[in-house]
UniProtKB/Swiss-Prot annotation:
Region (Disordered): 1-51
GO cellular component terms listed in the entry, alphabetical order: ribonucleoprotein complex; ribosome
InterPro entries hit by this protein: Ribosomal_bL34 (IPR000271), Ribosomal_bL34_CS (IPR020939)
One of the Pfam families matching this protein, by short name: Ribosomal_L34
Domain of life: Bacteria
One annotated GO biological process: translation
Record-stated family: Belongs to the bacterial ribosomal protein bL34 family.
GO molecular function ontology, one term from the record: structural constituent of ribosome
NCBIfam families assigned: rpmH_bact
Organism expressing this protein natively: Phocaeicola vulgatus (strain ATCC 8482 / DSM 1447 / JCM 5826 / CCUG 4940 / NBRC 14291 / NCTC 11154) (Bacteroides vulgatus)
Feature: compositional bias, Basic residues: 1-16, 31-42
UniProt KW Translocase keyword: no
Full protein name: Large ribosomal subunit protein bL34
Length: 51
């Protein structure tokens, strides 16, 4: 049986990345609450320092 978690960095960034969060009002609320809480990483995009 195939497992449910099949990791893919592209899917991860597209679904939970910074630009995706900024695209909706609720996503911006997520970012605001994470900023308020003082999270080091706001989104999964912050784990990468590529392009």
């Amino acid at each position: 049986m195939k497992r449910t978690f099949q990791p893919s960095n592209r899917k991860r960034k597209n679904k939970h990345g910074f630009r995706e969060r900024m695209a909706t009002a609720n996503g911006r609320r997520v970012l605001a609450s994470r900023r308020a809480k003082g999270r080091k990483k706001l989104t999964v995009s912050d784990e990468y320092n590529g392009k």
